[in-house]
């Protein structure tokens, strides 16, 4: 795995490839790093910055000054093939805020092996951070995420509880 990445998420596609999407520590451009493996995770190729799924988080302050955003952990799941007519459908979750702070927990959908993420749906508009996704063979999707109390909180680490959102792919597809 490439240096400077961490808290990566993985999904195996139906053709055997493994997709890797990672938080990029100290990312200057605010982009997550992605890669694919064709051999079960032994070697990773096509390292690149993801243009759609961007990092969030305020600049990291330390005793010598300010560093770029430290990013945020995210969730990733491939939906069971029996719920998607045999097609790879990936879902990705993380806060989505162009302003940088950790708010607006959002789920994105990909239908082409994580090359593009054309659909996204807001789950929670307030403070939110780390998330995890799971799906069952009945079509239920489960999102756990850190959640704050107020969208007006300036401190992006004020996440008071873990929340569970349950939905299905149709709900995601009704997003933008």
Which residues does each predicted region cover?
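Asp-box/BNR beta-propeller blade signature and adjacent active/binding-site loops
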Residues: 1-176
